[in-house]
A protein has these predicted regions:
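Divalent metal-cofactor coordination and adjacent catalytic microenvironments
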Residues: 1-90
Length: 90
């Protein structure tokens, strides 16, 4: 996932790898917080959500607010989609 996020942000250096990995982890935790199953991180919409979150956190091209809105919208849509809802651990 780190490589995909770096490519999406047009970053080739390894200097920000720790920060970006932290953003990736935070995005996945945020998705889980609203009940989204992130166990299959090869799902295109999960990857897209993580990329949007990272663009928001990095204020990519000074458009962080736009990426925040896009991430929030996708997160809300995924939380309502049956295919992405995590199964209860009852």
């Amino acid at each position: 996932m780190l490589a995909a996020v770096k490519e999406n942000l047009r970053i080739t250096s390894t200097a920000l790898d720790d920060d970006l990995q932290g953003d990736i982890d935070a995005a996945l935790m945020d998705l889980q917080r609203v009940g989204i199953d992130t166990s299959d991180q090869s799902q295109p919409l999960i990857i897209k959500a993580v990329k949007l979150y990272c663009r928001w956190q990095q204020d990519y091209m000074n458009k962080g607010e736009q990426y925040c809105k896009a991430y929030t919208g996708l997160m809300q849509a995924l939380s309502l989609a049956g295919d992405y809802i995590a199964e209860s651990q009852d």
